[in-house]
Amino acid sequence: LTAKLGYPITDDLDIYTRLGGMVWRADTKAHNNVTGESEKNHDTGVSPVFAGGVEWAITPEIATRLEYQWTNNIGDANTIGTRPDNGLLSLGVSYRFGQGEAAPVVAPAPAPAPEVQTKHFTLKSDVLFNFNKATLKPEGQAALDQLYSQLSNLDPKDGSVVVLGYTDRIGSDAYNQGLSERRAQSVVDYLISKGIPADKISARGMGESNPVTGNTCDNVKQRAALIDCLAPDRRVEIEVKGI
C-alpha cells in the first residue's frame, strides 16, 4: 500500500514518487544432503516501499509510465536463510476511467436591461393658469401638489421628467410658442421647489402643435365660444421616465 505524490512538469508530463509499505510472505525449500530430507520454511512481514517515476498522458484516459520501485529487507535470514532487497524497473500503461472531456462551461445569460417605463400625465392649462398667462394659480399649485405626490417615488438616479406646454391656435405661432415655453417652465420651477432634482426635470414648449380638438372648433366664430371650444388644446403634459 503506497501513497503517490506527483508534480506536473508540463500539462501532459508528471514526475512522481510513491511511499508506503508491502506485506510479504517468503517461502524456502532446502534439501538436506545428509538426511536426504527437504526442509521448508516461510516467513511473513512488512517492508518499506519506495518508488519514483515519470508519467506521460497520451490522452485524458490513457497514460504511460516508467517507474523504479525498491523494497527493503524481504524475509528473515534466521528463518529462511536470506534477507534480500528487491528492485523493479517497469514500463506500463494505465487507463483512467471517467476522464472524458469536461462539459463546456456555459456563461450565464446576462441579466436583461431594466425596462424603462414612461408614464404620462395631462393637466388642463385652464386649471393651472389664467387665460393667456403663465403664472400658476392657487388651484394650479394644488393640482401640482397632487401630481408631486405621485412623482415622489421616482428615484432621481433612474428617472427623468419632461414637462410639455401646449397652447390653442388663437394668436400667432411665435406668441403661442413663447407662452407654451413659459407655462412649461412655471410647472418645472414649482416641481423643483417641491423636491424634484433640477437635473432630472426639463421644460419644452410645443406651441399650438398637436391639437386634440382637431377640426371640431372650425365653425365656431364667436371668440368667447372659441376659447371654450379650444380649452382641451391648452394643456400641460408631463412625461415621467423611470426604471
Curated annotation (Swiss-Prot):
One of its GO terms (cellular component) is pore complex. The keyword Amino-acid biosynthesis does not apply. It is found in: Cell outer membrane. It is a multi-pass membrane protein. Sequence repeats lie at residues 107-108, 109-110, 111-112, 113-114. Residues 116-243 form the OmpA-like domain. The keyword Ion transport applies. Pfam families: OmpA (PF00691), OmpA_membrane (PF01389). Disulfide bonds join C217-C229. One of its GO terms (molecular function) is porin activity. Keywords: Cell outer membrane, Conjugation, Disulfide bond, Ion transport, Membrane, Porin, Repeat, Transmembrane, Transmembrane beta strand, Transport. The chain crosses the membrane at residues 1-8, 13-21, 48-57, 62-69, 88-96. Residues 107-114 are annotated as: 4 X 2 AA tandem repeats of A-P. GO terms for biological process: monoatomic ion transport. InterPro entries: Bact_OuterMem_StrucFunc, OMP/PagP_b-brl, OMP_bac, OmpA, OmpA-like, OMPA-like_CS, OmpA-like_sf, OmpA-like_TM_dom. Signal peptide: none annotated. CDD domains: OmpA_C-like (cd07185). The record marks R65 as: Part of salt bridge gating mechanism. Gene3D superfamilies: 2.40.160.20, OmpA-like domain (3.30.1330.60). With TolR probably plays a role in maintaining the position of the peptidoglycan cell wall in the periplasm. Acts as a porin with low permeability that allows slow penetration of small solutes; an internal gate slows down solute passage. Monomer and homodimer. Belongs to the outer membrane OOP (TC 1.B.6) superfamily. OmpA family. The extracellular loops are most variable in sequence, and in some bacteria confer sensitivity to phage and/or colicins. This is Outer membrane protein A. The lineage of its organism: Bacteria, Pseudomonadati, Pseudomonadota, Gammaproteobacteria, Enterobacterales.
